[in-house]
Amino acid sequence: MAGTAERMASNQKQVAISEFFEKNKHFLGFDSLTRSLITAVKEAVDNSLDACEEARILPDIRVKITKIDDKKNIVELQTEDNGPGIPKRSIEKVFGQLLFGSRFHAIRQSRGQQGIGITGVVMYSQLTTGRKTHVRSKIATETSAAIVDIGLDTRKNKATKTNEGRELWELPNGEMKEHGLEITCRTVSYTHLRA
């Protein structure tokens, strides 16, 4: 019997939290195609609201959903806000590492506390379309916006980054964006949503 217990114990392995959620997407709200799009919108908007609230900024949030591929039911979700933005050094952790956030030890209940939401969206987008999520962030103390395409290495629970750079962020009216965040990802969804 002792040999059996030792053999069984030697077969036990620890799995990364991101690897667990990769196999159990329904825990993150990605259990159906329609709900996946709703979850992605909710997570992005919740993050925008939280950031604006914490920075004491009246939120101005734009959400755009565009159908990209009719045959594969791929849609592109783009959100933009006027929040404080995210410093370049923090972008990869915010979008590419599960259980990373600022609300774990908050006393007051907030929209999100787990540090899972937006990274779950990045992961789901990557798993369903093979594409990374494009992030553009501008903070008030910098003259240009940081840009990067973020994916998730689920085995290591770490971000994968490509196309890093900086660019000026000009608004449609010709003014320069002072601060804010823009996220663009693609996901698979049903061809229609019922109101």
Could you tell me what each predicted segment is?
Residues 8-25:
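P-loop NTPase nucleotide-binding/switch module
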Residues 34-58, 122:
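Conserved ATP-binding N-box helix of the HATPase_c
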Residues 48-78:
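ATP-lid-like helix-loop hinge signature
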Residues 76, 90, 101-194:
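GHKL-type ATPase core
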Residues 81:
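Acidic ATP/Mg2+-coordinating residue in the GHKL
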Residues 85-87:
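A short glycine-centered beta->alpha linker in the GHKL/HATPase_c
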Residues 94-98:
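Mobile ATP-lid/nucleotide-binding loop of the nucleotide-binding subdomain
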